[in-house]
Amino acid sequence: METCASFRLSPALLTSSTKIYDHVKSHLKSAMIQFSDLNTTPVMSIISNMGSAGIVTFQLTGAVSDTETLAEITEPLAFRNHSFGGTYLHSREFFGKEIEDILVRFYKRASTASKLPEFVETKITYNNSITETRHTSTVDSHVSPVEKYLQKCFVKAKLILSIKTCTMLQKWLRQNKNKSPVARLHINETLTVLVVTVGDECTTIEFKSFVLEPADAFLTLDKPGNFGAVLVDCTAVVNLECLIQAIGICKVPSVCVPAFKFYSGGIVEVSSAHLKQSKSPSATVSTVLLDASESLKQPAEQEQPTTSQPSDPQSSNSVDKPSPPRPSISQPVRRRAPPRAIISDSEEDSDSDSDQDCSTETQPETSYREEPKKFTPKPTAPPNKRKQFEPLKCPVEKKKKSNSNSFVSII
């Protein structure tokens, strides 16, 4: 085996960053541990996905105390925090207690022609000089750091929110989660307000504006508050669930408060703005919220086929034009035909009788279709004429009475 690179971590710096790690460790189980800037000052980062449109990065600037790398290796090296088929978590062991030394070594097989590492070994030595932990896993493919992409973008505005404002904003966002899956963030330079819109609901947050460069403003804070540096008006559409999680991740009591950075291209970064009383300034947490404006177009496209389906011409005509009197008059005619068929049909009738009944049933319909105008000029039937349709019901009622009387007589 040939060693390609080795990194020795500082247990003291990791111990001082334990409070931030405990705050975000639930989001880092399926993360990637990455070592970047190998030619200058190596930086250790723990990167993980957050929901469907967010990325969490827990970065430690001075975590690497010593390094040895080959000149051919210039790209970042990364491996999984949680190895396949096991319960070992590298980050949990790195931020443990009573640790004396941590060594991360990348190596490869001597038979392979490639100079890139294939495996990684973590070796942790504890203070008792007896206990030692070793774990070996494979190296994942190259993953470009998020910072390199953000460095190419232009920072339009940076906004700091106090812990009280963040708590109220989180509560308001949770109450309106069912209104829309996305949230629209808009900063107005003239009015110095942040407008958050979810569906038909919106809330406004006022802040104090400073004439500063947003990229380098508010690195450390004496006291948290609502203030910012804005160059131009900016708008971004982000995932609502990711926004709620991002505010909670970057809000660590007595350590840091959320800072909103608006980049060109509709990207919003919620990072941790450290307070001066913080004891871990080298550890930073940031969440990148990707542009979610396309998610608004997809539901609209799915609803178009259902709303734009052409209706039947008959139904459209019935809605546009008033219904003629023909259906209202034809109802009693159709009621008279079925009783005749019922009376004539019996188990003793022959096939010829049934044919005659079928022909008689069709006669009212044909005569009605040929002369529909005979029924239109007639006024509503008086009560005397209405009784003409009731003789058929009389024998039914008499039969019921006779049956009931006979039944009583038998008893």
From Swiss-Prot:
Task: Write out the ranges of the annotated region (Disordered).
Answer: 296-411
Entry annotated with the keyword ATP-binding: no
Q: What Pfam families would the database entry show?
A: Herpes_DNAp_acc
Residue ranges annotated as compositionally biased, kind Low complexity, are: 304-318
- Biased segments, Acidic residues type: 345-358
Task: Output one GO BP term.
Answer: DNA replication
InterPro entries xrefs: DNA_pol_proc_fac_herpes
Protein origin, superkingdom: Viruses
Q: Which UniProt keywords apply?
A: DNA replication
Q: What does this protein do?
A: Increases the processivity of the viral polymerase, probably by acting as a sliding clamp that prevents dissociation of the polymerase from the active template.
Family, per entry: Belongs to the herpesviridae DNA polymerase accessory subunit family.
The name on file for this protein is DNA polymerase processivity factor
Q: Which organism is it from?
A: Alcelaphine herpesvirus 1 (strain C500) (AlHV-1)
Gene name of this polypeptide:
59
